[in-house]
Every structure is written in structure tokens, then in C-alpha cells.
């Protein structure tokens, strides 16, 4: 039984070792994105340069805009903007007033080519330099929302697991880390030795993380209160207790249980107040459940037809019943709904390659599109406003990294890389909102 339980925790590691030749199946169109140039009225002071650099990075980490900065220009008035040389669609003009030591007022103006008026303007007062990155992300959210009509995600967080000495018999260190969406401001919120931490998932209010762990001789599902660090065990069933996911209203969790010493797991929904269970599946290995945004259905992975694939079940069915998502998909794992409920992002293993990539399934037309082209990409998690997907990429040397890709597959960037094989990065989970 212990071997079965251990197998659940090394699932991500096993799939990361699929290194056969890859035939890329990326189908993305090239769309010209509006160019935003970020300029400042102060090119000498370090603080404005730092803020503007973060804004530019933010505005390049999405599917709708591209950005650059022009440090060589010191522009104090909109009339002085060199539109011809900039070739920009928009300019974000930032004006910095040093009120006192380490304290600034920052005015932000958005201008459009061939328009003499400000599109939008906002002022941030009494900003301490220690809040540099927070200010920059706030400005980025403001600019992104004004230019695209969509809410920005630049103040969101990522939770993920870092494992040191993963192959040692003893002394394996598991750390649950929360960082800014771009990997900065990392904080270890939970640390355990030789007791795995797996599949963290946020509550919708951002106050809790649920996760599974092997502790005290058995598996269980736990909650971690982020503000206090308080850990509470919420399941204690025999056998496998894994893959918890909170419902949108926070009143229930979906999870995988074996309910005894069996190699089969089924999906259940647990009422967190009463601890009552409702069974959703029967037969096979069923795991990795995720609620739809409206809380009315669940997607999960099952091998009931001989190979892993994605299935959908209603949470309101009187009896356990579910259906395969699509016959177009050969093998699939770890499904996640996009926030609008229109797409499902998952780990894809096509019939043409033994490698795994992150793919997008369009629920309206049934199309499947790979958005990454790595040899072992896994564990996708979607940003709360749907523009980006974070995931784990493992190279042919076995080194893992936490990466990000836009939902259209166009923009890729790295968040954190394990620089040797003695560290693994696993199980990213995107926060449900900005902080």
C-alpha cells in the first residue's frame, strides 16, 4: 500500500521523464499586438527606472500587448513625445516627484498616437521605495485594463512545491512556496522533511491553500491558512487521499480517494462543514479533479478506457456518471478550466509523440491546440483572468523549471529554474485574484 501511495506523489516526476522525439503540434496565428512604450520624466533617478522596467516586463507577459521602454528619452510633457521614432501605438508617461527620502508621488498618463488628449491618468501618492514592485504591478494592471478592457493579473500569486534531495532515502526537503506571479518575493509558507507536499490549490478568497501530504504513516488532505501558517488535517481515510480542489464557493472540495488499500481511486466531493462525501466516479484510476467556474461540473483524469484521458461529470447527478471530453485526445492529464469556462487546459500526450505538452481544448468547437512544445511539460494552472498558463517544464537532463505561456501560445517566459537535478519544482497553482 505504501508503494501505491508513494506512486501518487511521484506521478509528476514520472511523466517528466518522457523524452521521446517530439513532433510539434502548435497551431498559433501571428497577431500584431499594440506596442506600448513606457517613458519617464526622470532618467537619472534609479527608482523610476526600476518601476518602468517592471511595467515593461509585465506588459510583455500577456497575450494582448507588447511593450518597450526608452531610457534615453526624458519626456516631461506630452508635446515632446517623439512619435515617429518611437513607432508606438500608445505611450505610458510616468512622472515622479521625490517628496522626501524614499518617498514618491507617481503620476501615470496614457496617450494614444495621433491623439492630443490623455486617454487616462492616475496618481499614486506617498509611495515608499520598498513598494517598488507592488507599485509597478499596480500601474501595469491599470494600463492593461484601460487598453484591453480586461483585468490585469500582475498582482496575483503563484504557489508551488520545491523539493531538495528528491532521490535521497532520507533528508528530502519539501517546501511550499508563494511568490509574485513573475517569481519575485518568494516566501516559504510550509516546510517538511521526508513528508511530501503535493497538488496545492487555492481557496477562492485567497486565504487558504489545500494540499495533500503523507504524514504520520498515512496520506491526508490538509488546509494551510496563509496569514497564520495554521495547518489542519481534513481527511483521514485509509489509502490514497489526494488531488484536492476547492469549489468556487469554498464550501466543498473535490478529491481522489481509494477508501482502502486499493490501486483504484475515485472522485468524491466533500462538504467541508459536515464532512459528508458524495461519490462522483466508479471504476479505474480517477484523479486530478477541478471544478468548473460555476461549480456545476468537474473535469478529471481517468484511465477507465485503457489510457488516461479527460472526463467531465456533473456535481448534481444522483448517481456516479461521467463522459469523455473528446475522442480527438489520445492521452491527457491534469485538466483545468479557464475562468470563463470556455476552454480546458491540460497536459497532452498525442498519438504522434511520447512527449507531453500543454494544450488548450476549445469547448465550443472541439479543437485541440498545443501551446507549448517542450519534451516534458506538465502541471498547467491558469491565471485568474485567463490570459496566461503556468506549468512545469523538464528538459532532457531532468532539470525542471516553472514557466509561463500565453493562452495563444505566443509568449513564453521562465519564472524559476532548478539549476541541477538535485532540486525539483512541482505543482504550481495560480491564485484566484490580485492581492
Curated annotation (Swiss-Prot):
Disulfide bonds: none annotated. Its main location: periplasm. Part of the Tol-Pal system, which plays a role in outer membrane invagination during cell division and is important for maintaining outer membrane integrity. GO terms for biological process: cell division; protein import. Residues 1-20 form the signal peptide. The Tol-Pal system is composed of five core proteins: the inner membrane proteins TolA, TolQ and TolR, the periplasmic protein TolB and the outer membrane protein Pal. They form a network linking the inner and outer membranes and the peptidoglycan layer. The gene is tolB. GO terms for cellular component: periplasmic space. The keyword Cell cycle applies. It is found in: Periplasm. This is Tol-Pal system protein TolB. InterPro entries: 6-blade_b-propeller_TolB-like, PD40, Tol-Pal_TolB. The keyword Cell division applies. Belongs to the TolB family. Keywords: Cell cycle, Cell division, Periplasm, Signal.
